From Swiss-Prot:
Enzyme Commission code: 3.1.21.4
Gene from which this protein is expressed: hpaIR
Protein name, entry field: Type II restriction enzyme HpaI
UniProt GO BP: DNA restriction-modification system
Domain of life: Bacteria
Organism: Haemophilus parainfluenzae
Amino acid sequence: MKYEEINFKVPVESPYYPNYSQCVIERIYSILRNQKDMGDDRIIINTNLKKGLPLENINKIAGPMIEAWAEEVFSGIRDNRDNQYNLINVEAQERLGISDIILQFQVNNNVITGNVDVKATSNDIPDSGKSPNITSFSRIRTAYVKDPNFIFIILSIKHSVYVKRNEYTNLMDGIMQIIDFNVYDLKYISDSDISYNPALGTGQIQIKDIHYVSSQKRTTWQMCQLLDLKYLRSKKRTIEQFYNEAKRNKWIKD
């Protein structure tokens, strides 16, 4: 069996997809930039530890904390019905969902949905942000087939952690401060920046270095083909495994 012989369903996105993607990216970036400019860029962790937080292990809780901060920021904007970003809906997703947060923006007469995956990286750890797992190969491949206009956003948030004595309790508070952030549409990340790790189920799509990403315009079908190529180039995968996965997830025409 050859890849070229498989009768795939070919997803075709709207011609307006690039504009909608750019709109979602710009609004997310603008919201977070404004939040940081206002000084609301810190998570304060109160503890009863006299020496403060164990900074060498703080990255273990950073992900959920940063994700909760981002969801709270977006929800605060949504609660203002006249917000300048036309953000009309925010939904935090379950732990095993394809994304962490769903954002919906009103754009003219359309509602545009961004599926946001929040990735926390540490400014204090040299290799933080290198090859993070983004999503399951089969899950994202299926999402693009089911909805050719599926917008999967990677929100990379870099933080730094330090301790500061609380003048009221005289104990040490942990301060998790947002240092920088970037917003990407997975579909437009360059071929050279995307990698595939066969570990965990059908494998994980990874970004080689989430802090340094270049862009490359492509269609939804081209993205599906790129994902397939990454999968099939793995020495631990075969065309037979791929075909079975394609049948199971209905990527092939009946």
